[in-house]
Design a protein with these regions (language model features):
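Feature marking well-ordered beta-strand scaffolds used for ligand recognition
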Residues: 1-222
């Protein structure tokens, strides 16, 4: 037993090792040696604020998505020394001290990634000056560092994202629309096309062979 009364939030198995995150008031990251699977050995326990829900091993580093102080986080841990891991970087989604939320914190399919390019796409919701904002944050892992790139705006929260074969275009989908963005320069991504997929209609008026549909303003619903 690793952490009595704590909740297991994330687990990642990688070769001879297992990486586990639990949470009660702080976020312990455990590294367990599985080479003797009849007697797993706890190698280390790292205490950091918040907790992680998604883990991805990248050589001697561990990428994590989680929450700290009601903000979505993207973190990078150095795990080159399994007995002494440490948090090397942490980014927050949205403005400082502003609440944010992400489907990625309970469904890993919400996180888009291109492993060969070190790209991650994190959807999140936040608020600024009383307005709800829906964003897709681009993150790039390069030369052992995590860099925060540009953002893609959505009318309602983006749920899935993927790139084309060239890696130059990002397709992000919400319950309402498909947004196509050019991400050749990840720091200066820009929208190329926005296509409606579904919408809520309040009233429909028929004029001969034409119809006028009046829709609601976007909400935070799927």
């Amino acid at each position: 037993e690793l952490a009595e009364r704590e909740t297991l939030y994330a687990t990642r198995f990688d070769g001879n090792y297992a990486y586990l995150v639990t949470f009660l008031q702080v976020d312990p990251l455990f590294i367990v040696d599985l080479r003797d699977n009849s007697n797993p050995t706890l190698l280390s326990e790292l205490i950091v604020p918040g907790w992680s829900e998604y883990l991805e091993v990248m050589d001697d580093q561990l990428f994590a998505v989680g929450v700290e102080n009601s903000q979505v986080t993207a973190s990078l841990f150095d795990i080159s020394d399994k007995s002494n891991p440490f948090l090397s970087q942490r980014f927050y989604m949205g403005d400082e001290n502003e609440y944010s939320w992400s489907e990625a914190n309970y469904d890993e399919k919400a996180i888009g990634k291109v492993a060969s390019e070190g790209l991650f796409f994190i959807p999140y919701q936040t608020w600024a000056e009383g307005n709800q904002l829906n964003k897709l944050q681009i993150l790039k892992h390069e030369n052992g560092r995590l860099e925060k790139g540009g953002q893609i705006d959505h009318r309602i929260v983006a749920r899935r994202s993927f790139t084309d074969a060239t890696g130059h275009y990002l397709f992000s989908i919400s319950g309402e629309e498909l947004v196509v963005s050019n991400i050749l320069d990840t720091n200066n991504a820009f929208e190329v096309r926005r296509l409606p997929l579904a919408w809520t209609t309040e009233r429909t008026h028929i004029f001969g062979v034409n119809s006028l549909q009046i829709e609601n303003a976007p909400t935070n619903n799927w």
